[in-house]
Amino acid sequence: MGKGILSLQQEMSLEYSEKSYQEVLKIRQESYWKRMKSFSLFEVIMHWTASLNKHTCRSYRGSFLSLEKIGLLSLDMNLQEFSLLNHNLILDAIKKVSSAKTSWTEGTKQVRAASYISLTRFLNRMTQGIVAIAQPSKQENSRTFFKTREIVKTDAMNSLQTASFLKELKKINARDWLIAQTMLQGGKRSSEVLSLEISQICFQQATISFSQLKNRQTEKRIIITYPQKFMHFLQEYIGQRRGFVFVTRSGKMVGLRQIARTFSQAGLQAAIPFKITPHVLRATAVTEYKRLGCSDSDIMKVTGHATAKMIFAYDKSSREDNASKKMALI
């Protein structure tokens, strides 16, 4: 399948070297056009999304299946037919889908639109420009993309809830209790902690070094300092092992489903009024660091967020708790 798609980009034969540039361009375009009839849109989407990370792959495939379900797209059409569509009109139609047709939120519509644009960009490159790139609207009253909320939806625990959650989690699973503390202190994503290797830990300095990949290219190294008491528990847990820090009984890396289950269970046992997910711990870390008076730049050095806007989005402290509450200027 992959080789079939790549055949769209076959090199031109040397027999055309005597022709003019315009003649060669025309021949090449005709060659692409004929080959495009051999590929269905469904085949192309499956091939393309397989090269993306799991989350994006699942999201994009779901988007196109949803677009077909409401009649905005047919995955059975070939690439010739797809190239003749007015992609900008389809983007507009995605944003104007009525609630009577589907219960998409504004955020869902924007995800669907982003998926569609990404597909046209991929095919534009594969077909040497025959498939046009869908252009998002930037008009004030009909923007394709805009921020739907000031802060993220994820809840955050207060200090008492955090202590209660950790207490209950330790009863359920001591290893997952260590995982939760690793995430909290560093404001880390679950994937960053679950993939952690023992070689990244320095027990003498009580630090753990995390690597973040930005756009799959630029590596960002973040060093988090942990309390000595925690490092003692962690060292006892690891013993003489090598490899991943947190492992199952069979020595494999702990999965996301495992901690999602135990975190949720601990939250219930601690009587926390919202579901505790791994991402709640990241929001909790940002909120707690802000409450303790840390600057945005200091928190960014811990969490790895690229901008202060993201820190603001994760900060769940009251918007009334600002400088005007602490001092009067008049």
UniProtKB/Swiss-Prot annotation:
Pfam families: Phage_integrase. InterPro entries: CB, DNA_brk_join_enz, Integrase-like_cat_sf, Integrase_catalytic. Residues 152-327 form the Tyr recombinase domain. One of its GO terms (molecular function) is DNA binding. Keywords: DNA integration, DNA recombination, DNA-binding, Plasmid, Viral genome integration, Virus entry into host cell. It comes from the Bacteria. Belongs to the 'phage' integrase family. pGP8-D is required for growth within mammalian cells. This is Virulence plasmid integrase pGP8-D. It comes from Chlamydia trachomatis serovar L2 (strain ATCC VR-902B / DSM 19102 / 434/Bu).
